[in-house]
Amino acid sequence: MKKVRKLYEGKAKIVYETDEKDKLILEFKDVATAFDGVKKEEIKGKGSLNNEISSLIFEILEDHGIKTHYIKKLSDREMLVWRAERFPVEVVVRNYAAGSFVKRYGVKEGTKLEQPLVEFFMKSDELHDPMVCINHIKVLKLAPAELVPEMEKIALKVNEILKKIFEEKGILLVDFKLEFGRLPSGELAIVDEISPDSMRLWDKSTGENWIKTDSV
């Protein structure tokens, strides 16, 4: 598998086309960002850690019958994925009140929600990822409206799987975000990554924030 050209470089990853047109290589960067990429800091080993965690989670989800774009881990900082038609929508699942949820609704940080809450955001650094509903998604053509209920269903299933894994390690899964796309086969799948960059994790006994993020 050979890299052909750089397709895109984002805050945390570089995406490369390969000599197989339906496959891409994701290279994770040793860079931490905040405030929509305004603040940046190089952290040695971050890329390999995110690649390792994301690869492991994708493999676990695939074992549970959840489709992802993941094919295999190639190296410390690289993974091979299926090329997908990505939807510019972030799907956030919340188990506890934190981040923008606290600012929007005035709920005390750390409050356990009665049930997992799924929210949708338009993926746009320029617009600071505005919150959207299914009607926005339909009118703005962010994703096929008929797929939104399935995205929510998958997100809740992922939540149950990850919550159990983290709780066994003494970690609370406060919230996390997913991105979705359509594979060459036409199947709906989770794309991008699932790593500490896309989660908020707290120590179960102390409430300490394990991962500092400006997301969701």
From Swiss-Prot:
InterPro entries found in the cross-reference section: SAICAR_synt/ADE2_N (IPR028923), SAICAR_synt_PurC (IPR033934), SAICAR_synth (IPR001636), SAICAR_synthetase (IPR050089), SAICAR_synthetase_CS (IPR018236)
EC nos: 6.3.2.6
PROSITE patterns for this protein: SAICAR_SYNTHETASE_1 (PS01057), SAICAR_SYNTHETASE_2 (PS01058)
Entry's Gene Ontology molecular function annotations: ATP binding; phosphoribosylaminoimidazolesuccinocarboxamide synthase activity
Alphabetical keyword list: ATP-binding, Ligase, Nucleotide-binding, Purine biosynthesis
Catalytic activity reported: 5-amino-1-(5-phospho-D-ribosyl)imidazole-4-carboxylate + L-aspartate + ATP = (2S)-2-[5-amino-1-(5-phospho-beta-D-ribosyl)imidazole-4-carboxamido]succinate + ADP + phosphate + 2 H(+)
Keyword flag ATP-binding: yes
Pathway assignment: Purine metabolism; IMP biosynthesis via de novo pathway; 5-amino-1-(5-phospho-D-ribosyl)imidazole-4-carboxamide from 5-amino-1-(5-phospho-D-ribosyl)imidazole-4-carboxylate: step 1/2
SUPFAM superfamilies: SAICAR synthase-like
Alphabetical list of Gene3D superfamilies matching this protein: ATP-grasp fold, B domain, Phosphorylase Kinase, domain 1
Entry superkingdom: Bacteria
Presence of keyword rRNA-binding: no
BP terms from Gene Ontology: 'de novo' IMP biosynthetic process; cobalamin biosynthetic process
NCBIfam families membership: purC
Family membership noted in the UniProt record: Belongs to the SAICAR synthetase family.
HAMAP family attached to this UniProt entry: SAICAR_synth
Protein's UniProt name: Phosphoribosylaminoimidazole-succinocarboxamide synthase
Species of the source: Aquifex aeolicus (strain VF5)
